Amino acid sequence: MTSQKDFLFLHIRNLPYFRGFLRAVESRFYEDLDLPAPILDVGCGDGNFAALTFDQQIDVGLDPWHGPIHEARQYQKYRLLTEADGGRMPFPDGYFASALSNSVLEHIPHAQAVLNETACVLQPGAPFYFCVPNPNFTQNLSVARFFDRIGLKSFATAYRRFFNYISRHRHCDAPDVWEARLAEAGFKIERWWHYFSPSALATLEWGHYFGLPSLISRKLFGRWMLAPYRWNVSWLVRLLRKHADHPLHDAGAYTFYVTTRCKRSAKSPDFAFVS
């Protein structure tokens, strides 16, 4: 994969390296995807991903969490920021020409309702892009695989549950599960691919433990890295580059979906602004 931007450097200087590493891979996928306006970002969070990924303005960023969405203002990437639940969007039917939801749906208990509502506010034929972890996420965790190899199956199961919990995952489902959800909402999958190999996942997994200094820096100084400069992260960029430049893998822990809104669905009558 080639890119005009060095997404790896851009992300890891702004985030803990394990998160920035993954986001850099995902940013590159969008370079070849069409996002006609008006664009909806479902679960925009603090806006960092969109600010680093897209050159164009995003029309609307939507997120239910008060703190992160107010942080998103600093990037001036969104024309409008809306604090609202994704299952009850305050927009008319067929308003948006495209939508994305980057590493969001796996955290939402009512993912089906969010998909249904996203379909409602999209125009027929509009693209919708999203990425989520799949069952390989828990199966490929290095510590759990070690316990499997030495016969401690109960320890492996407990670790997988623990890591999924700290990752705040509600869903790590296969493409056929998402295909059923999408069909119910009124989407058709055009294509999908797995990415993030077992070795890349191990790098992310151990980053949760080695990233404690970044968390301390964030708490004390309001930033993940005290010196976010190329000279300070060049060694880390070199270490991660082999994974970032070749992210596709049949046993990848994450899946990226390219879908199309293919039919009109009935909008829930009780939507409202959430303040």
Regions found by a protein language model. Name each.
Residues M1-P92, S98-L100, L115, H249-Y257, ...:
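Conserved N-terminal segment of class I S-adenosyl-L-methionine
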Residues Q112-E117, P127-V258, D270:
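S-adenosyl-L-methionine-dependent methyltransferase catalytic module, highlighting the catalytic core
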Residues S98-P109:
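A short SAM/SAH-binding and catalytic strip from SAM-dependent methyltransferases
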Residues R88, E106, F137:
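Active-site micro-motifs of SAM-dependent methyltransferase domains
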Residues D85, V104, Y195-F196:
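Residue-level "edge-of-site" marker
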Residues F49-A50, P109, T138-Q139:
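Glycine/Thr-rich phosphate-binding loops of Rossmann-like dinucleotide-binding domains
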Residues I108-P109, L122-P124:
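Helix-to-beta-strand junctions that scaffold the AdoMet/dcAdoMet cofactor pocket
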